[in-house]
Amino acid sequence: MDRAQARKKAEALVAKMTIEERAGQLKYDAPAIERLGIPTYNWWNEALHGVARAGTATVFPQAIGCAAMFDEEEMQKIADVIAEEGRAKYNAFSKEEDRDIYKGLTFWSPNINIFRDPRWGRGHETYGEDPFLTARLGVSFIKGLQGDGETMKVAACAKHFAVHSGPEAIRHEFDAVVSQKDLYETYLPAFEAAVKEGGVEAVMGGYNRTNGEPCCGSKTLLKKILREDWGFEGHVVSDCWAIQDFHQFHKITNGPKESAQMALEAGCDLNCGCTYAYIMAALQDGLVTEEQITEACIRVFTTRFLLGMFDGSEYDDIPYEVVECKEHRNLAVEAAHKGMVLLKNDGILPLDKRKIRTIGVVGPNANNRIALQGNYHGTSSRYVTVLEGIQKEVEDDCRVYYAEGSHMYKDTMENLAWKDDRISEAVITAKQCDVTIVVLGLDELMEGEEPDQSNRGQAGDKASLEFPGCQQRLLEAVVAVGKPVITVVLSGSAMDLRYADVHTNAILQAWYPGAEGGTAVADVLFGRVSPSGKLPVTFYKDTSDLPEFTDYSMKNRTYRYMEQEALYPFGFGLTYGNVKVSAAEFAEQPEKEKPVKIRCTVTNTGKWDTEEVVQVYIKDWKSKYAVRNHSLCGFRRVRVKAGESIETELTIDPRAFTIVDEEGKRYVDSNKFSLYVATTQPDARSTALTGHEAVELRVVFA
């Protein structure tokens, strides 16, 4: 069913409703209209990295870990599995007449905000700091969720529109002031791609204001940009209780009727919250019109018809057996493999069980199930922590010693105990062992969303990039033993790894790797698979390198604009192979405003088969509006066997050659560019870390 047909059906159904019934359907918990055969429906459903908050489901790596795969095809597979399980659960729930929250088909995912500052607590819900990477992965995820069937498999929702990335503590009152250049160059491209390429069915507005307008009541964002400029035809939903913020915290309206008016006039069709309960009162006061209410109602029912809720769907027979089936769980572990980023390796990895008799596993995240999943997660029927994964891997080959070592953030583990009461046990463990794996980091309670956190007053954000003091002291104590140490970090954002970089033998960034992430960590540590993830964010040296958190200017932010050297750059990640782009050329002569095709040779001179990510960055040499450094404009994941060379081809979109000026206008402003082809960025730090130079291709348009 195409949109025109679905809208026609929606118009016919809405025409049979009273105005009161139409207004009632604009709330997230829409009531039944029994006389028309319309069941109750709850629009609030989550599927960030698996069907969330609805019981059992496959728990994939957190979004930031999926982003580290740099793999559009894998991302679409993951989303298709999520949609499959979402349909299966919806089918089963519907047969039981269970239409509660989190049990529907309208999923408020993906989060395609830009992770501009590593202190933002919700950054791990995103695909990182780069607008191009975020756009490509967002489109893949949306296509995977929505499918290409006669009806929509599930409905995706791109959030949070727009310019939304902390601080969490003041998100209900904050005004994100941003230049037109930064708006159109950094904050909007992923949403534009979601609409124009992904065909996303819904868009969610953010809590904050953007340049003075509340996002859920912004005519600039919702009318001009979203609908008029981009041609969006789906529905817009508010973030939860965001419309209430208009009068309660932003103080820009005098009460709920005016807030409902502002949101509805701007084109916010659906209210997650209770403010649209005042729509009828606003109608009686002449603040809104019947036409506005009717149009919003038609839009939300168009979505329901596209999903086949009234006429049936080819997905109605998806059985419950697909939920967390073996095939889906295997895909989740595969995704964790691909997303893990090896930041340092002095040759200690992969570990050889034949040469090791004792292994120490210490740290607060070594046996922490919570740290596997990140936020917005489902419930797995089985979890494998890092400790459990290592124990299973070595079985009878090695003795595994375990010590928790420290609390996640408290100085003591037991009441009345001395400070650092578990560190001595970790030291004893390290002394017993040939190698010690220290598993540090955070979890969803330490970084995340404002109402859900317990991280000592930061409302989900991080005060700094440092590990909590107890964890840092633990690491230093284990290192002081003088035996080999491997650092494994479970976190959703960049941490301060300067000490680990100098003093430990290897560092593996494992993100929040999913329910069975411990299996994936063990597979990487012991060489069952080669790590091949790439950083979707910059690992800064410390917070002194960062601008103020509330400053939304891109100056000195992210790899495209940063002025100092990174500890670990965006796009960086080692493998067990030794892979480089050994040659690159244009497949055909580049022409202005046409796709540019690059053919390159990728060579693995190492001893291990591995996957690798070929990356292309563009540098504009002439325009004064160009980004300070360079920008990602293409990537492709490839597999290269030891001693092998392969050829691959990447296509660079003409948009890569454009700039955005101070008025927010995008156009080609130069005829001289460089394209850098490598397995990392073309910056000096990446070259030093990998030992490989990027291949430069010059483009000069006539």
Cite the ranges covered by each PLM segment.
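Short beta-strand elements
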Residues: 685-702
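Glycoside hydrolase catalytic-domain context in secreted enzymes
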Residues: 1-663, 669-681, 702
